[in-house]
Amino acid sequence: MAAPNQVNNNVIYFNAAAQTLLTIRFRIKAIVWVSSEGAGLDIAADDDMLLSDGEGNKIVGKRAEAAGQGLELALPGGLDVMGLTATTLDGGVLYVIGEAL
């Protein structure tokens, strides 16, 4: 499995399914799933997104009901996880924002 792009200690960027980062402890503060037209990674109707922790436990998932319908989810208290996997990412890009622990 390929690794996602870790932009810095605060942002992890997934642009394909099955990208895994198992060796990081991370406090998730926000999750953003958006289209990236320039990269040809648009969200289409019925596209699915599923983010899991390193043990395969579901963190969040969503099915787009219309084209371009992503997700912006804030977790004010944060959610501590060990490892991250974009289990399903049919379209768009996924940003996981928080801090490495």
Q: Language-model segments: which ranges?
A:
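Surface-exposed, low-hydrophobicity beta-strand/loop segments enriched in small/polar/acidic residues
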Residues: 1-101
